[in-house]
Amino acid sequence: MELNTLKPAKNSVKQNTRYGRGQGSGKGGTSTRGHKGAKSRSGYKSKPGFEGGQLPLQRRLPMYGFKNPNRVSYKPINLDTIQQLAEKAQLTVINPEVLHQHGLVSKRDKCKILGNGLLKTKLEVTAHAFSASASAAIEKLGGKANILNIYA
């Protein structure tokens, strides 16, 4: 046996049915597309949500809610991430500029500190928002949780 003589096992490779290759093949003529109509033509593509002229589901249901153009979205940062950063860079003050320098947030991100994880060191943390558990954990160790104005 050599690489140039390898073949798949007998009956392990099934041939695909070739449509539109003459009447003798059993799949010639209309090539399983039926007679006439848009679906029998080449280039036909159904539109998403089209239900054959019946009023589509997305138009039958009423409109609901809206997207608030003045919404404020925050980048969540947990206490365990802040603890790792403080240990790695020997920091006592954490603010959005420091988080940006270490690649945790982009320059325009508004950050919210969340209380997931343990904080072991006393830190002065400045952010746009804090969860109740995060600010409690920071102040429990004698640190400070300073809130920035989100519109500044």
UniProtKB/Swiss-Prot annotation:
NAD found in the keyword field: no
PROSITE patterns noted in UniProt: RIBOSOMAL_L15
One example of a Gene Ontology biological process annotation: translation
Record field: compositional bias (Gly residues): 21-31
Biased composition regions of type Basic residues, renumbered to the chain: 33-44
Keyword Metal-binding: no
Pfam families: Ribosomal_L27A
GO cellular component: cytosolic large ribosomal subunit
Keyword terms of this UniProt record: Ribonucleoprotein, Ribosomal protein, RNA-binding, rRNA-binding
Stretch list, region Disordered: 1-56
Coiled-coil regions listed in the entry: none
Any one GO molecular-function label of the UniProt entry: rRNA binding
PANTHER family: 50S RIBOSOMAL PROTEIN L15, LARGE RIBOSOMAL SUBUNIT PROTEIN UL15M
Subunit (UniProt): Part of the 50S ribosomal subunit.
Similarity comment: family membership: Belongs to the universal ribosomal protein uL15 family.
Functional note: Binds to the 23S rRNA.
Protein name, per record: Large ribosomal subunit protein uL15
Species per Swiss-Prot/TrEMBL record: Amoebophilus asiaticus (strain 5a2)
Taxonomic classification: Bacteria, Pseudomonadati, Bacteroidota, Cytophagia, Cytophagales
